[in-house]
């Protein structure tokens, strides 16, 4: 049975007894795409050389979506993630931030949308 879906496995959560690069190779050998988290701690050239299909990665280094200052930082570091995503052939950056303001309450969507629209440009 074939599927139109790409199934991906988070390399941060499986085969934890293996070094990260070996996890990626194993996931790829099993026919799955790969997701990664903090790219700043990874050998990007080695990951790209595995031939694995990367479908998602954390798309920022620091920042948060719950306030102006944090969102500006998130967007600034998201820009640094773009060339890494290109190097991996990865089409998706996950900008989850915290989704909360500094009081621990859900942030207002009307605040978040303009922030994310700036990044899309």
Which residue ranges define each predicted feature?
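N-terminal pre-domain/capping segments
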Residues: 1-91
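Active-site acidic/histidine proton-transfer and metal-coordination neighborhood
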Residues: 67-121
